[in-house]
Amino acid sequence: MNYSSQACITAFNLAYNLVFQASNYYQMIISFCSVFPLIYFLLFKLSKSSFHGNLKTIFISYFVSLVAFSMTHLTTSTTQIIKSIISTDNCDLIISPFPHKIWNFFILFFLTLSTFFPCSVTIERYFAMETAEKYEKASVVMGPILVGFNVLLNFCIIFNMLKDESYTDGNVSFSVIPAVAAQKAFTFFIIIFFVNLVDVIFDLILLRMNLKLKLQLKNSSLAVKYQLEEVYQSTKFSVFLILIHIISFGIYVSAVVFFRYFGNLIISDPDSLFGVRTFSTTIVPTYNFVIGSFSSFFNRIKLKKSEGATIQMSSTGKSGANNYDQAIFSIWNSVSGPIDRNVTLV
């Protein structure tokens, strides 16, 4: 595609702006780093967790969307860096319309997809809390339905938002949304943000219900304690994860909207303003890195508390001896390898 000389000069000024260059390198590094804790948590923690199948399905889909977003940003930022290194002509810095449209779709799709899942988690957790004593036996139907609905709804919204865009403006960043679609995207971001704020209100109520559930643990039978303890711990994890996600997304939306509409009030140079606006998009990959690390850490604490609760549930008599015996051999197995011994927990 042929571009005007002015478009190529503009592309050169934007591509080699120091702020834009810094955002590219930071985005590449943080996206790369975020993939490892996310995949680690998915494969070695979440997939092996004792969460109910409905909640696990939603969480797996949520973390897969985060991994996909980080991989997308890693690919686009690396491509932008390579183009700035190997380009011999100013016009070579401009991204072709077709790849720009494809990667821009993926960026928006995975960005917004992850913001739908907190609402799904809240719906699932309310159902779990209302049926806590028998939820363990509930069929795994709600989770897949909520995930399928989220994916389909988000796909239709993003597809209709971008389907008529030609992407012929000549941009140097895959994250840049065409002017007409940008207004729709920002409106969509704000709507999602306020929906998530409403979700926070329900999550606070859910947290209060969860505290009441914790009190029930003291006066429940051993069999019921196991079920209630799992609902309590998984709900606690869910609420904190949702709150962190919404805070991060709120910061992202605020930064993007502020620098788009008010950035010129504090940054007069348009090239530097463009660089700052692209830098604000690195908030989400940074969140992905933090949430992957946080989830693994929180899960470790949850496991330790669950082990402690298991021992405390029965600490006297024959069952108490079995619990103590199992705990000792669990520690021994973790140090010296597996031992062929059957320990029954009563």
From Swiss-Prot:
Alphabetical keyword list: Membrane, Transmembrane, Transmembrane helix
Keyword set includes Iron: no
A GO term for molecular function: transmembrane signaling receptor activity
Transmembrane intervals: 26-46, 57-77, 102-122, 139-159, 186-206, 239-259, 278-298
Location in the cell: Membrane
A Gene Ontology biological process term: sensory perception of chemical stimulus
Family listed: Belongs to the nematode receptor-like protein srb family.
Name of the featured protein: Serpentine receptor class beta-11
Organism this protein belongs to: Caenorhabditis elegans
